[in-house]
């Protein structure tokens, strides 16, 4: 990612990249309020979306958030979504220094320090920050990333230096995307009154009004008169907006994917009931005593690897923001030539500090799955029903009725979510969706290696916890045994041989078996359940029509999937939960289209149809 070249000129931040000030050198605070943050009215609605082109030092965001929090809740939206795109990275310490030099620091100190605490490294991606009743999605990408995003903004801040020095931020391509991502009466706020900007806005349906700008300047405001119609060539992957009879949600399964989702849903005011077939938490794969938060390291520009990296960093930031966890890092080792090739292509990746055959992932570390899941459920205030083995559902009058073993029935749920991990294989039967149930066994040893970092190679070693040390894990697609096996413990020990002296005596004090859920392409399966018969009929000619407009997809109403997280559920569950909340609650989708397509439940069928099969 490009780093901003920034100096101070007239006591104001000045960009050497664009030969322009970040804002008015005389009275930047009041100009920002006048042009952007105080130039529109709040609407008393569920979600309010503001999108900004050019985050800069974040002044517009902090002013907006301050205004939002100071407004009486009954006179503002319930949730503020603020999406800001920035292509030039400013270092954390430099941001703090800028606020101090401008004498803004004390005014924004609390909000700014919270922001800086979770500020990411200089790497492209979408990074979420949690504030009171507000989500900030900071998008570190070029502005062309808008074509990959999906939301309907209420207000746009078109910022980003003078149009004659940064024309890309105001050109026709950008304004088309702005119009696509807007709804009727969406307001455009901008300091500019450039004629070519006015022309582009009018071309895509905005009503443009000239108005007096800050002090002597002239500026424009614009309003979308009618929502833009455009041809969707990939409608089979597009969202369908949800309509809910109530805010009751049922989640089947009580592992990590369920726990993160329950927490995220609780932030949106949903009442969550969780149904678990076991008698307590921690009986499945999410119940290990210790585990590792880490990322796959694949060759650069491999989509699965890029998604794993984003999932990992966002999970780390989520656990730090929500559970106040601290991570000391994890060390990954290249244990064969293929792994070494992968490491060699990632030497410039800021997530991986690579030296020879080692990679240090600073944002990773040891996790304690059992406690983590328990804490998230407690925060969500979800009601967990143990000893409830799910069997079937009915959907009538816009609500689900659930049937469980022993003739137990629960009803009146507007949303049903499958998050039962490896057990999903027994409930989902799409023709092209191939699911695997993979057995894994971890071994509990008497402490034998004093390490503050988890070590991961052929197998992994966790730091000591409560007089035991966890190593693992075995991997067997063909074994369905629930009992621990001596040969698996032996294999786990053999796989950590590179970390210990051959004369070290290891004492086994226990083992634990769990089952992972995998898809055939290793991406998780997250999103709406779909109408298979509709897809097969409507999209049967995709081989010949894939470059033409497609009819909107038909989904199974308010039934959602959240499974196939494999062995990295503690990473992938965070993005999965946010994405599902966005679908359920009609929020901005927090993922790029390429990743939405990669995790979509219908992707396997669509691939087959595109081949004419």
Curated annotation (Swiss-Prot):
Superkingdom of this protein's organism: Bacteria
Protein name (record): tRNA 5-methylaminomethyl-2-thiouridine biosynthesis bifunctional protein MnmC
A Pfam family this chain is assigned to: Methyltransf_30
Known cofactor(s): FAD
InterPro entries hit by this protein: FAD-dep_OxRdtase (IPR006076), FAD/NAD-bd_sf (IPR036188), MnmC-like_methylTransf (IPR008471), SAM-dependent_MTases_sf (IPR029063), tRNA_MAMT_biosynth_bifunc_MnmC (IPR023032), tRNA_MNMC2 (IPR047785), tRNA_S-uridine_synth_MnmC_C (IPR017610)
Region of interest: FAD-dependent cmnm(5)s(2)U34 oxidoreductase: 252-613
EC number(s) stated in the UniProt entry for this protein: 2.1.1.61, 1.5.-.-
GO biological process, one term: tRNA processing
Keyword Methyltransferase in annotation: yes
Ranges where the record places region tRNA (mnm(5)s(2)U34)-methyltransferase: 1-225
Keyword Transferase: yes
Keyword set, alphabetical order: Cytoplasm, FAD, Flavoprotein, Methyltransferase, Multifunctional enzyme, Oxidoreductase, S-adenosyl-L-methionine, Transferase, tRNA processing
Catalytic activity field: 5-aminomethyl-2-thiouridine(34) in tRNA + S-adenosyl-L-methionine = 5-methylaminomethyl-2-thiouridine(34) in tRNA + S-adenosyl-L-homocysteine + H(+)
Summary of the function given for this chain in its UniProt record: Catalyzes the last two steps in the biosynthesis of 5-methylaminomethyl-2-thiouridine (mnm(5)s(2)U) at the wobble position (U34) in tRNA. Catalyzes the FAD-dependent demodification of cmnm(5)s(2)U34 to nm(5)s(2)U34, followed by the transfer of a methyl group from S-adenosyl-L-methionine to nm(5)s(2)U34, to form mnm(5)s(2)U34.
Family of this protein: In the N-terminal section; belongs to the methyltransferase superfamily. tRNA (mnm(5)s(2)U34)-methyltransferase family.
């Amino acid at each position: 990612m490009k780093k901003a070249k920034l100096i101070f000129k007239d006591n104001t931040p000045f960009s050497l990249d664009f030969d322009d000030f970040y804002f008015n050198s005389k009275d930047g605070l009041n100009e920002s309020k006048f042009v952007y943050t105080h130039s529109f009215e709040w609407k008393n609605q569920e979600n309010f979306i503001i999108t900004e082109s050019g985050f800069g030092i974040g002044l517009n965001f902090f002013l907006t958030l301050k205004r939002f929090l100071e407004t009486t809740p009954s006179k503002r939206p319930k949730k503020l979504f603020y999406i800001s795109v920035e292509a030039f990275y400013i270092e954390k310490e430099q941001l703090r220094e800028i606020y101090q030099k401008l004498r803004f620091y004390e005014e924004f100190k609390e909000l700014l320090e919270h922001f800086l605490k979770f500020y990411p490294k200089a790497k492209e991606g979408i990074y979420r920050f949690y504030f009171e009743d507000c989500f900030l999605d900071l998008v570190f990408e070029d502005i062309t990333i808008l074509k990959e995003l999906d939301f309907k903004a209420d207000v746009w801040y078109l910022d980003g230096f003078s149009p004659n020095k940064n024309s890309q931020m105001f050109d026709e391509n950008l304004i088309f995307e702005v119009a696509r991502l807007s709804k009727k009466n969406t307001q455009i706020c901008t300091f500019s009154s450039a004629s070519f900007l006015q022309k582009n806005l009018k071309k895509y349906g905005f009503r443009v009004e000239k108005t007096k700008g800050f002090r002597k300047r002239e500026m424009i405001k614009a309003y979308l008169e009618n929502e833009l119609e455009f041809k969707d060539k990939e409608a089979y992957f597009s969202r369908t907006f949800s309509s809910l009879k109530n805010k009751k949600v049922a989640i089947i399964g009580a592992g990590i994917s369920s726990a993160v989702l329950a927490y995220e849903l609780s932030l949106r005011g949903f009442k969550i009931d969780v149904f678990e077939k076991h008698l307590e938490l921690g009986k499945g794969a999410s119940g290990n005593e210790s585990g590792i938060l880490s990322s796959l390291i694949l060759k650069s520009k491999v989509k699965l690897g890029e998604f794993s990296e984003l999932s990992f960093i966002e999970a780390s930031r989520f656990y730090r923001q929500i559970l106040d966890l601290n991570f000391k890092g994890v060390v990954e080792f290249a244990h064969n030539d293929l792994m070494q090739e992968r490491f060699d292509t990632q030497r410039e990746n800021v997530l991986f500090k690579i030296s020879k055959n080692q990679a240090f992932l600073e944002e990773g570390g040891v996790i304690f799955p059992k406690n983590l899941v328990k804490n998230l459920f407690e925060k969500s205030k979800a009601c967990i029903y143990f000893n409830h083995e799910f069997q079937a559902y009915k959907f009538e009058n816009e609500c689900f009725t659930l049937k469980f073993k022993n003739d137990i029935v629960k009803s009146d749920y507007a949303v049903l979510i499958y998050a039962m991990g490896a057990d999903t294989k027994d409930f989902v039967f799409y023709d092209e969706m191939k699911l695997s149930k993979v057995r894994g066994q971890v071994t509990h040893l008497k402490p034998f290696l004093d390490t503050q970092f988890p070590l991961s190679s052929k197998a992994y070693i966790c730091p000591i916890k409560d007089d035991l040390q966890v190593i693992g894990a075995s991997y067997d697609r063909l074994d369905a045994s629930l009992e621990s096996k001596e040969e698996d413990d032996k294999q786990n020990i053999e796989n950590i041989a590179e970390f210990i002296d051959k004369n070290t005596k290891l004492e086994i004090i226990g083992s634990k078996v769990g089952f992972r859920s995998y898809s055939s392409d290793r991406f998780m399966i997250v999103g709406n359940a779909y109408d298979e018969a509709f897809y097969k009929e409507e999209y049967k000619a995709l081989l010949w029509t894939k470059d033409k407009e497609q009819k909107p997809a038909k989904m199974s109403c308010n039934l959602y999937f959240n499974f196939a997280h494999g062995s990295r559920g503690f990473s992938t569950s965070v993005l999965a939960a946010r994405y599902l909340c966005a679908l359920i609650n009609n929020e901005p989708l927090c993922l790029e289209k390429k990743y939405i397509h990669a995790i979509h439940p219908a992707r396997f069928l669509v691939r087959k149809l595109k081949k004419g099969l």
